[in-house]
From Swiss-Prot:
Annotated PANTHER family: DEOXYRIBOSE-PHOSPHATE ALDOLASE
Protein name as it appears in the record: Deoxyribose-phosphate aldolase
EC number of the protein: 4.1.2.4
Function as written in the Swiss-Prot or TrEMBL entry: Catalyzes a reversible aldol reaction between acetaldehyde and D-glyceraldehyde 3-phosphate to generate 2-deoxy-D-ribose 5-phosphate.
Compartments (UniProt record): Cytoplasm
GO CC entries: cytoplasm
GO biological process, any: carbohydrate catabolic process
Family named by the database record: Belongs to the DeoC/FbaB aldolase family. DeoC type 1 subfamily.
NCBIfam families (alphabetical): deoC
Keyword Cytoplasm appears in the UniProt entry: yes
Pathway: Carbohydrate degradation; 2-deoxy-D-ribose 1-phosphate degradation; D-glyceraldehyde 3-phosphate and acetaldehyde from 2-deoxy-alpha-D-ribose 1-phosphate: step 2/2
Coiled-coil segments on the chain, per record: none
Amino acid sequence: MKAIKNKGQDKTMNETTHRFARLVDLSAVQATSTEADVRACAELAARYNIISVHVLPCWTRFLSTLLPQQGTGEVMIGGPVGFPGGGHTTDTKVQEVRQLIADGAREVDMVVNIGKVLSGDYDYVREDLRRVVEAAAPVPAKVILETHYLNEEQIRRVCEIAVEVGMKWVKTSTGWAPTGATVEKVRIIADQLKGRIDIKGAGGIRDLATVRALYQLGVRRFGMSHGAVTKVLAELEQHPERFPELNAD
């Protein structure tokens, strides 16, 4: 399998486009994601030096053959754990983490046990998250809240648990629920976290206006599809001034 060469930052790329690319988790995590989709994501990521590509676990090892060089300044591989419903046992999630890392993942995004959150069983949720963090270390872990199904109190509780157990990121959504990274839910997350750990927005992020709105709330990683990322990159290549916040930071 021929690897896709990562040439680093394209010399023709403006600084705004480059900075945006380093905020993107390029994702092919739908049930219908194919080998061609994974390859297309790898090619786009290598071209723009996108920070990471996330695929379903069955594609992780294949993706690692396309993106063999990882580390600072390179394209990382990420993978989901307990995806998409979060209802896997903790032991299963731990095994998934170990397999993903063995296959080349350098980030893991774990779905919280939504049913346990809705049931108010926060002791279970805490231990579930803690063991995934422990299994992943030193690979950073994100917890996916699937905010569509949670109310404000539940979002705040899980955010606090995430901080307590050492999660590096709180992520809004899987992209499988009816809604994803809404301004309303991201505002709650940002207010609760207060910068202690980072925020990833995912689900329904399809244009620059949405990216900017979420960035202004503190989102610093964007889970987006190949089509959405391509659209935003093309706009920023022509109009870098449309994302002034990125150049101000």
